[in-house]
């Protein structure tokens, strides 16, 4: 916790120090009317106030129909609370330009010095709090108390939480998470890749949900909430590059549209923080309703236009900007994968890398490329659908509309196809194997191409992403098509988020419990954001003070939660980079996907031929044994102790059904630890005997006659790669003993053995040796093979 607090303090210090050094000022660049048929309106408005020298610089271009002396009633509001109320006569302040006022245009560029008593009324915190929510309302009356005009000015202190550093940090960390999951998938670390991929995808969807909820056309978004949402606008592709804006303006005009120039206009005031658009054909308003009016020189942007303007993107270039960055990032992703593939091939050809490195990636790189592009389209699904739907209502130009149609077909079609194929393969797997994970994780083609659609979820809930994409699509429909009604958007999106929140708590579809908890928290924050924007839409007709306070709640909650998610992704990435086995750091998913996944194997040419022959021989030998043959040794021991006539258990096992049932019941018993130790020691001792035997007489081996009773032919003889002799059936039915006697070895016993006693002792052992070291020793086949007997050694 101490580390988190320290890191948070460092981040806040880095963001605040560059701004704190600036001079204290209050500025205003937008003036709007707050009553119908106001006799005073602004063509351009620029005011700045410095409390240090009490100077007020104003540059005004106004139009008025007033012809009289005027009196001003000033109300100053901060976060919806009235903090200053003053009434004054304009003539008494010495402003000769307004004493009296005559009809026509008023153009003033001047400096006035405010009295110290008025400067002291402004609290010092107003110059330090970022994205201050303060405005001044002036009601102008004539000498007979007739209300002539109402104007409203919004102030800013130049400090904001919308920082370039925050945008870069969030984008880079999210990109690192996606890159790490992609690399892990290439190396085959499926468990770690699934976990970090699921959490990174959830992080992306959360960032997009914050940007989407800020795109609602609500009445009044508090400045602090609007500024924080700008930090995550990059997740929707809204990134300004100057030369691109010129290209987009040319393209819109070349394809039959008319490009907007609000950012470069010098006689246009734009208000983006709050307010209602000018409502035509409307003449009746509630007395207490706060209605702002624009005119031909003052525009009020809200919704998607507001976010685009705050990102310094023209309205007619918003859709083009989002589409262009989506395509460019897609080309970069495809080029990166292809460059990696051919770079690896070049390194192998030049001898800089072994031929078995990245074998699975080189073999399936086309399906990996398709799966990566599908995953990328899935990430941009929210961006493409919202911008395309909104373009149908804006109609910037014919060319942009055609591109929007293509992207709608592309995104919706591919996501529908991925959902269909996932459900198809899962249903087929259930039909064939009674388990959806068999084909979804056992088939490499399906996993590489469509794995992005279901690996984040439990195998039982493979279909959840179809529900998630439907949820995103429905939200996109309301955000894109319902920009004319912020209340409709806010209420509909809250209901949709509430339904999905209940569903995710009910089903818990993600691959493990921690991932489910993270995504439930994400859905909780998303639901709270939707709830707050219902208040911002003025759906409940509450006072603006409520919305202003909720704006700070929105900022604090989302900033803290974003920090936690980013630290989680960084922690996962650090653990993976400094771990030799990343899969061991994560708990496996609560399904059997790991049992079906195919792990990376070396290339066929990388395996030595002799080693391959030996492995094949061992495999065929293993087939000669029944299942759990090692564990049957113990059951044979127990059976032989009960046999009074000394008959071998192998012969008696085929006698009656009752004995077969007893042997099958003992197959599941496992040897104890002491028995395993004795067995390993016996094998090591016999190997040492064989080594000493070979060293004592390496050149005295000659051909020897094999006794007829031991050279019985086997009807089930098998051939092995690289071995020319024919195997014989052994008495123990283990395929290991008598096969070596057909290699025509002849042992010269007189020259090897010192005397008859030693020869007799060596050829007539009290127990039969089952190890491979006994190939040079003659054994009595009538003796039982019991290597677990304590007297065996």
Swiss-Prot record:
Xref: InterPro entries: TRP_C, TRP_Flc/Pkd2-like, TRP_N
Q: Which PANTHER family match?
A: FLAVIN CARRIER PROTEIN 1-RELATED, INTEGRAL MEMBRANE PROTEIN (AFU_ORTHOLOGUE AFUA_7G01610)
What are the TM regions of this chain, as residue ranges? 164-184, 195-215, 224-244, 250-272, 318-338, 373-393, 398-418, 462-482, 485-505, 517-537, 552-572
Topology in the lipid bilayer is annotated as: Multi-pass membrane protein
- List of residues that carry Phosphoserine: 610, 771, 774
Organism of provenance? Saccharomyces cerevisiae (strain ATCC 204508 / S288c)
Q: Which CDD domains match?
A: ML
Which residue spans belong to the Lumenal compartment?
22-163, 216-223, 273-317, 394-397, 483-484, 538-551
Where is the protein localized? Endoplasmic reticulum membrane
Q: What is this protein identified as?
A: Flavin carrier protein 1
Q: What does this protein do?
A: May be responsible for the transport of FAD into the endoplasmic reticulum lumen, where it is required for oxidative protein folding.
Q: Name one GO cellular component term.
A: endoplasmic reticulum
Q: What family does the database annotate?
A: Belongs to the transient receptor potential (TRP) ion channel family.
Going by the UniProt record, its keywords in alphabetical order are: Endoplasmic reticulum, Glycoprotein, Membrane, Phosphoprotein, Signal, Transmembrane, Transmembrane helix, Transport
Q: Bias regions of kind Polar residues — which residues?
A: 701-719
Side Cytoplasmic, residues = 185-194, 245-249, 339-372, 419-461, 506-516, 573-793
Segments for region (Disordered): 649-674, 689-731
Chain positions found as Phosphothreonine: 626
A Pfam family the protein falls into: TRP
Question: Which residues bear sugar attachments?
Answer: 143, 281
Q: Name one GO biological process term.
A: transmembrane transport
Signal sequence segment: 1-21
A Gene Ontology MF term for this entry? FAD transmembrane transporter activity
* Protein's gene: FLC1
């Amino acid at each position: 916790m101490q580390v988190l607090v320290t890191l948070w303090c460092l981040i806040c210090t880095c963001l605040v120090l560059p701004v704190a050094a600036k001079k204290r000022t209050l500025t205003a660049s937008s003036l709007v009317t707050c009553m119908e048929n106001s006799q005073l309106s602004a063509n351009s408005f620029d005011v700045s106030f410095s409390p240090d020298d009490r100077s007020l610089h104003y540059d005004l271009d106004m139009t008025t129909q007033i012809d009289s002396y005027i009196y001003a009633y000033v109300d100053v509001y901060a976060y919806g609370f009235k903090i200053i109320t003053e009434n004054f006569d304009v003539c008494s302040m010495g402003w000769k330009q307004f004493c009296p006022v005559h009809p026509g245009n008023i153009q003033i560029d001047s400096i006035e010095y405010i009295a110290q008593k008025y400067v002291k009324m402004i609290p010092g915190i107003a110059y330090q709090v970022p994205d201050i929510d303060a405005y001044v309302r002036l009601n102008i009356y004539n000498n007979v108390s007739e209300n002539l005009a109402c104007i409203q000015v919004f102030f800013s202190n130049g400090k904001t939480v919308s920082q370039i550093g925050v945008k870069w940090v969030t984008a880079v960390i999210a990109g690192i998470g996606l890159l790490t999951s992609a690399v892990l998938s290439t190396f085959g670390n499926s468990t770690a890749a699934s976990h970090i991929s699921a959490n990174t995808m959830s992080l992306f969807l959360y960032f997009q949900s914050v940007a989407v909820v800020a795109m609602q056309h609500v009445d009044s978004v508090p400045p602090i909430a609007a500024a924080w949402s700008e930090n995550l606008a990059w997740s929707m592709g809204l990134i300004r590059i100057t030369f691109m804006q010129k290209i987009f303006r040319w393209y819109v005009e070349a394809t039959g549209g008319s490009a907007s120039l609000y950012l470069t206009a010098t006689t246009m005031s734009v208000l983006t923080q709050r307010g209602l658009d000018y409502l035509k054909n409307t003449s009746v308003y509630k007395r207490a309703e706060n209605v702002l009016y624009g005119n031909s020189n003052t525009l009020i942007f809200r919704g998607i236009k507001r976010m685009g303007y705050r990102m310094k993107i023209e309205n007619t270039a918003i859709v083009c900007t989002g589409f262009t960055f989506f395509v460019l990032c897609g080309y970069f992703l495809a080029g990166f994968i292809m460059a990696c593939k051919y770079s690896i091939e070049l390194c192998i050809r030049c001898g800089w890398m072994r031929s078995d490195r990245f074998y699975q990636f080189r073999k399936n790189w086309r399906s990996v490329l398709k799966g990566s592009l599908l995953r990328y389209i899935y990430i941009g699904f929210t961006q493409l659908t919202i911008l395309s739907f909104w373009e149908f209502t804006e109609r910037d130009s014919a060319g942009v509309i055609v591109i929007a149609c293509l992207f709608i077909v592309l995104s919706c079609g591919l996501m529908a196809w991925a959902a269909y194929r996932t459900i198809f393969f899962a249903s087929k797997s259930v039909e064939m194997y009674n388990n959806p994970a068999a084909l979804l994780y056992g088939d490499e083609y399906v996993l590489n191409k469509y794995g992005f659609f279901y690996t984040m979820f439990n195998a039982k809930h493979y279909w959840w992403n179809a529900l998630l994409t439907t949820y995103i699509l429905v939200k996109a429909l309301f955000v894109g098509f319902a920009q004319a009604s912020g209340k409709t958007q806010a209420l509909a999106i809250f209901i949709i988020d509430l339904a999905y929140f209940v569903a995710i708590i009910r089903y818990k579809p993600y691959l493990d419990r921690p991932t489910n908890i993270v995504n439930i928290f994400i859905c909780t924050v998303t639901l709270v954001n939707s709830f707050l924007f219902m208040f911002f839409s003025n759906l409940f007709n509450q006072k603006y003070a409520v919305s202003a306070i909720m704006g700070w709640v929105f900022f604090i909650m989302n900033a803290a939660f974003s920090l936690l998610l980013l630290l989680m992704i960084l922690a996962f990435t650090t653990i993976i980079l400094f771990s030799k086995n990343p899969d061991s750091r994560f708990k496996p998913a609560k399904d059997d996907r790991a049992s079906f996944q195919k792990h990376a194997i070396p290339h066929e040419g990388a395996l030595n031929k002799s080693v391959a022959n030996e492995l094949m021989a061992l495999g065929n030998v293993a087939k000669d044994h029944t299942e759990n043959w090692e564990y049957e040794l113990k059951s044979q021991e127990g059976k032989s102790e009960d046999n009074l006539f000394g008959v071998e258990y192998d012969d008696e096992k085929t006698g009656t059904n009752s004995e077969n049932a007893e042997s099958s019941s003992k197959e599941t018993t496992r040897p104890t630890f002491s028995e395993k130790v004795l067995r390993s020691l016996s094998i090591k001792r016999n190997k040492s005997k064989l080594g000493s035997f070979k060293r004592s007489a390496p050149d005295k081996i000659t051909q020897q006659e094999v006794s007829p009773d031991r050279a019985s032919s086997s009807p089930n003889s098998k051939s092995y790669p690289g071995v020319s002799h024919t195997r014989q059936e052994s008495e123990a039915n283990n395929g290991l003993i008598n096969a070596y006697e057909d290699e025509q070895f002849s042992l010269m016993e007189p020259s090897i053995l010192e005397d008859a006693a030693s020869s007799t002792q060596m050829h007539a052992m009290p127990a039969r040796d089952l190890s491979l070291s006994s190939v040079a020793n003659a054994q009595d086949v009538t003796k039982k093979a019991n290597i677990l007997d304590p007297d065996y050694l």
